[in-house]
């Protein structure tokens, strides 16, 4: 996460900083981190060079702020009312459907907004790796909490491992998102997230399990 020593700004200053980060995040999603310069961010955000220097030490600092913002975006996506607490098979299916609905608007344009950053920062320093790891840990944790509750209620068998299933959901999403972006095909992400949900469903007690629905039943919007 960004340095704790980052100076505190006024409310207006925080708003300006957040706007710059939002602009940088959008540019980095479209062009990549390496393809996004500080000058491009400054011009697009319509701020001065002194403002950039005031809010960010350098491009690395700005990139860390973008990681933090995208981490918040992931949490917000998973907080949609229809997803509840991700603690039912219906909620997990709604999660898969929500991702499929975003294929044309998001995933075919740049992949996953968080995963695309991680992919480009594989060779980054340990501090940035820590930022990215924190995001993935939090993401997995959202599913983990819901799956623990499902097992407690008896919606999953006692032998179900909530941590294993949570990691499977996030890993399936990330792999599917990458392949959908690379191939420009909706099929990989659609197949991956639906297969991950069906894997969770396979741990439901026999009396509550149902037949898997066809993976291609729901078509992406757009």
Task: Mark where each language-model region is.
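Helix-turn-helix
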Residues: 2, 19, 23, 27-61, ...
């Amino acid at each position: 996460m960004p340095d704790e020593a980052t100076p505190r700004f006024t409310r207006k200053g925080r708003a300006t900083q957040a706007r710059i980060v939002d602009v940088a995040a959008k540019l980095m999603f479209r062009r990549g981190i390496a393809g996004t310069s500080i000058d491009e961010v400054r011009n697009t955000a319509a701020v001065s060079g002194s403002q950039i220097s005031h809010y960010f030490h350098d491009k690395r600092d700005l990139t860390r702020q973008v990681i933090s913002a995208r981490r918040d975006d992931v949490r917000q996506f998973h907080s949609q009312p229809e997803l509840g607490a991700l603690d039912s098979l219906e909620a997990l299916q709604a999660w898969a459907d929500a991702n499929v609905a975003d294929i044309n608007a998001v995933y075919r344009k740049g992949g996953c907004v968080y995963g695309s950053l991680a992919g480009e920062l594989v060779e980054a320093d340990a501090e940035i790796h820590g930022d990215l790891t924190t995001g993935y840990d939090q993401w997995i944790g959202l599913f983990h909490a819901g799956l623990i509750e499902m097992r407690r209620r008896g919606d999953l068998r006692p032998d179900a491992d909530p941590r294993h299933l949570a990691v499977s959901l996030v890993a399936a999403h990330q792999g599917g998102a990458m392949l959908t972006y690379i191939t420009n095909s909706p099929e990989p992400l659609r197949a991956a997230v639906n297969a991950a949900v069906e894997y969770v469903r396979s741990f439901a007690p026999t009396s509550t399990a149902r037949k898997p629905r066809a993976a291609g039943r729901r078509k992406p919007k757009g």
